[in-house]
């Protein structure tokens, strides 16, 4: 017998990441790799990776749905509509998506067991203590002001490892090849700042900036963050290793040219 006083539980609305993304052909994104199982896209700087608060149909995922919507729809929300990892909005470069169950699951497993090789390029202030090295400071996520950030804690943090190599340098700046060996929030940005090399354009991990804001202080222009997801190497479904690279972004290219550095290709 039904209890007339019983109230059915109101179902919470699905978040943007659970709703089938709308295709948006107006967003132009270069396809770097497509073997029918895995897709690699070159995310532009300033483009959100996936739908979320304030960005429902103007993201990389929406662009991917315009070209590969049928395959991505079949993967569904449980497989993040094919999205295998994310980049901050301020960061451009290679992003991988699965196009089939086997393609998604294979690369997802490689991320989890850390057999994916990811390399970033960063232009930073100063120079690290050595031309090659590694930062292993543990990181913990905390809320500061209007955003979530990563900070070093002596106990209770998560393992974080970032390897760097100096490619070029001047008296005031350096061009770094950076390899995150773990995947913590803002890991590269936080670790480089900790070794005295904040990335050019950094608005969060800078000693002279307020620690509780992601916006530039009054009177200071908001210059671009010179960090790029440059290269990813993974094992494809066929079993061979594939290396995918993005071209150096315009802001980083201009800075490197002004410094007369050799341009990575």
Language-model features and meaning:
Residues 1-148, 155, 169-171, 241, ...:
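RNA pseudouridine synthases
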Residues 26, 78, 159-161, 173-175, ...:
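Short coil/loop residues immediately preceding or within conserved phosphate-binding loops
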Residues 56-65, 100-101, 112, 141, ...:
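Pseudouridine synthase
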Residues 85, 132-133, 157, 186, ...:
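Residues that recognize and position ribonucleotide moieties
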Residues 125, 167, 179, 235-237:
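A generic structural motif
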Residues 155-160, 204-208:
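PP2C/PPM family metal-dependent serine/threonine protein phosphatase catalytic domain
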Residues 164:
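Long C-terminal interaction/binding lobes of large macromolecular proteins
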Residues 175, 263-264:
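Acidic, low-complexity Ser/Thr/Gly/Pro-rich repeat segments typical of extracellular/periplasmic
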């Amino acid at each position: 017998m039904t209890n007339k006083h019983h109230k059915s539980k109101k179902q919470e609305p699905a978040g943007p990441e659970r709703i089938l993304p709308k295709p948006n052909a107006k967003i132009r994104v270069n396809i770097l790799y497509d073997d029918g199982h895995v897709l690699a896209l070159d995310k532009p700087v300033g483009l959100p990776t996936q739908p979320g608060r304030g960005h429902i149909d103007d993201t990389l995922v929406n662009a991917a749905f315009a070209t590969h919507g049928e395959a991505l729809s079949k993967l569904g929300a449980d497989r993040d509509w094919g999205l295998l990892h994310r980049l901050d909005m301020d960061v451009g470069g290679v992003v991988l998506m699965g196009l089939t169950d086997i393609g998604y699951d294979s690369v997802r497993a490689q991320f989890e067991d850390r057999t994916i090789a990811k390399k970033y390029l960063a232009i930073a202030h100063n120079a690290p203590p050595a031309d090659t090295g590694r930062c292993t400071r543990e990181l913990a996520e905390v809320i500061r002001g209007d955003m979530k950030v990563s900070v070093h804690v002596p106990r209770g943090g998560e393992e974080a490892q970032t390897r760097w190599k100096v490619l070029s340098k001047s008296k005031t700046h350096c061009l770094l090849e950076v390899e995150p060996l773990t995947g913590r929030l803002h890991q590269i940005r936080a670790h480089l700042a900790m070794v005295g090399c904040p990335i050019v354009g950094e608005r969060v991990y800078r000693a002279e900036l307020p620690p509780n804001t992601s916006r530039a202080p009054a009177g200071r222009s908001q210059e671009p963050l010179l960090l790029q997801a440059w290269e990813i190497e993974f094992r494809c479904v066929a079993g061979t290793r594939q290396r995918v690279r993005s071209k150096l972004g315009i802001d980083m290219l201009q800075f490197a040219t002004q410094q007369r550095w050799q341009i990575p290709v």
